[in-house]
Structure formats: structure tokens, C-alpha cells
Amino acid sequence: MIIDSHIHLNDEELFPRIEEIIDRAKERGVKAFICVGYDRESSELALDIATMYEEVFAAIGIHPSEAKHYKPTDIEWLEANLSHHKVKAIGEIGLDYYWEKTHEAKQKELFIKQIELANKTKLPIIVHMRDATNDTYEILKNHKDKNLSGVMHCYSGSWEYVKNFTDLNLYISLAGPVTFKNAHSPKEIARKIDLSKLLIETDAPYLAPVPHRGKTNESKNLKYIVKEIASLRGVEIETIEDATYKNTVKLFNLGEL
């Protein structure tokens, strides 16, 4: 059994086909899905989907790309809905200097506000980080409660920084890029990381793994990510499935599935 720890079933590419996507994934051993929001509208839909489907859980939050035009009422809505029993995390939140370099201050402000909500509610955080490794680390180190957990989603940083994040009680999640031929950093991390700190995800509809690279991604493709990690480590596929399943259940407090 495996869990897709990060998927956008609320995306326009997937939502119209949501039942067949869930069914195909379940046929391939996917037991549960964390449907992740990135603004208020997508977070509302993530929560609606989680309410409709027993095997789907929601993460709600505001992505750094929304920092320049989010409203205070969005944060108020977020806080008001964090107690819903199907909400399992705040995310995705973080910093992205690749697309949004000109709004660093607003991104940091939004990131810190949502970390503070996580500290208050004890919900784990799902962190988006792109071209912002040092600033992301410094904010987490200085603003996240020591015992608050979370995950570095679709981790794109270096192996050298992995210990910095895991020392902050954060997991590292690998996605489709670990299967890409020249993705040296994800492959190095897959080989070296302590399995007790590893999660897997599709980030669908994005980042489809080989052999479906460039196509619309979905949870049924999680098996290719598991297979690649197992191959890189020289272990059985079941070893990766069992470890990441247990880690995901623990992080998101999913209980018995």
C-alpha cells in the first residue's frame, strides 16, 4: 500500500475525471490521497473533495505565487477551516523565487503568517521551496515551533541541506523528477536519506515520472517513483512502500485507513 502525499485533484486537469483517477490509483495500491490547495478557491475545493471521498484528505493554504494579491479574509477563512476533521495540513506554503522573485517580502510575510497558524493548531505544514533554500530554512528555523512537523514537498534542494531540514522535524518528499535521467540531486537523496524521513508524491497533474514524462500526471504513476527509489537503494519495492506509508500516516495523523 502507498499514499500519494501531494496531489492536486482540485486542478482543472484532474477534477473532471476525479473518480476514474481515484479508481485507477486504488487498483495500483494507492490507499489514500492528500489533496493540496494553493489559494482560497483551490483550498475550498480540496476540502469539498475530501468531504466527498473517504480516501481523500485535504491540505489548505496559500502558495507563494499568491503573495502579491492574497487578502486578509483569505487568512481568516483558512484559520476558520483548519479544525475540519478532513483537513490534515496547512499547505502548500513557502517561498518561490523562480517565478516570483520580485515579491520576496510579501512571500516571507505570507509564509510566516501560515507557519504561525500551524504553530497554533499543531497541524503539519507542506512546504513549497524553489530557488529559495536559505531563506526557507531560516524562516522555518526561526518561526516554526520545534515540535511542529511538516514536509519539504517535491524537494529540489541539495543533499547537503537535507539534514538541516530533517533536524527541524521535517520530512523530505520525492516526486517524478527522481526518475529523470539527469536529475542527480533527487537520485542522490533517494540513495542516502534515512527512510524514516522519506515521503513520496506525484504532484499531479505535474511532473509525470518516466515513462510518462511530459504527460498529465496522476496517482497511478506513483509506482514508478517507488520502483526508482527502490532500485537506487538496492532494496525491495515493498521496503519503500511500507516506510513511506507509515511516515505519511504518522505525519498527517491519518489513523487507520
For each predicted feature, which ranges?
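Mid-domain alpha/beta scaffold segments of enzyme catalytic cores
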Residues: 1-257
